């Protein structure tokens, strides 16, 4: 996560309504239409089903209350508006309660192609559709419960699991490999890199391998992990994650597949 934000949260009024400007609605519309076109034949069916169930459209930035109600009807999950950056402990606590934390601001036009921190487009368009899928929603909630139980000493490696699944995961389907991670489906550069470029590495998902794989948040990903089903994700929570993390620490990290970030 970035250490500080140049954005401030959009706050709701007394009725819980978030007021977005015409320019902010236009940015949402441009992002939505571009990604929906680009994702055809690239994102998994469960993702598109979720977009439909949430009633997302290019018309305007969606209201969190509408997203929350539709998610609750689908899987009992919900959302909670938060500042751009929150502590890992708060993040995992919300997941454990079945609430996905959402940044409420939308990127400015100068950041329309790439923003390092999560905005409402990444959060709602990227994360929320799959939370209408019961197996996936169960995985996310149980993952939060495990993270809360394990505590801050395990956060670094827990975020690696989150990064290579929830953010940048791929899934094999009868129709071929498809993307589901929010960092892919909400980004044109990541979508093209993962699904068109042929310049990245695809690995079968293996928990120990993931736990030993470093990542950078500010580059197109060089490595993606591929699952066979969303049930495979939920099975992660049946493992002794704490013991696996301790084992990964003892074994050490794999060499990074990227250059060190310039200081």
Question: What is each residue range found by the language model?
Answer:
Residues 1-131, 210, 222-263:
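The feature captures two recurrent sequence modes
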Residues 110-114, 120-232:
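A contiguous, surface-oriented mixed alpha/beta subdomain in the mid-to-C-terminal portion of proteins
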């Amino acid at each position: 996560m970035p250490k500080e934000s140049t954005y401030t949260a959009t706050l709701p009024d007394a009725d819980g309504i978030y007021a977005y400007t015409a320019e902010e609605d236009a940015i949402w519309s441009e992002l939505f239409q571009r990604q929906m076109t680009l994702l055809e034949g690239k994102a998994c069916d469960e993702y598109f089903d979720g977009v439909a169930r949430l009633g997302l459209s290019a018309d305007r930035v969606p209201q969190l209350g509408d997203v929350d109600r539709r998610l609750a009807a689908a899987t009992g999950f919900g959302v909670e508006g938060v500042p751009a950056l929150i502590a890992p402990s708060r993040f995992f606590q919300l997941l454990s309660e079945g609430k996905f934390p959402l940044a409420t601001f939308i990127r400015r036009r100068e950041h329309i192609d790439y923003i390092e921190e999560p905005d409402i487009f990444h959060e709602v368009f990227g994360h929320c559709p799959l939370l209408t899928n019961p197996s996936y929603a169960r995985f996310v909630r149980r993952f939060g419960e495990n993270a809360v139980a394990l505590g801050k000493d395990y956060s670094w490696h827990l975020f690696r699991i989150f990064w290579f699944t929830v953010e940048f995961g791929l899934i094999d389907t009868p129709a071929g490999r498809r993307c589901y991670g929010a960092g892919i489906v909400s980004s044109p550069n990541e979508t093209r890199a993962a699904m068109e470029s042929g310049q990245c590495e695809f690995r079968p998902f293996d928990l120990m391998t993931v736990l030993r794989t470093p990542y950078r948040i500010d580059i197109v990903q060089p490595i993606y992990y591929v699952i066979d089903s969303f049930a495979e994700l939920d099975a992660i929570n049946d493992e002794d994650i704490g013991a696996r993390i301790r084992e990964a620490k003892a074994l050490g990290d794999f060499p990074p597949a990227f250059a060190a970030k310039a200081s």
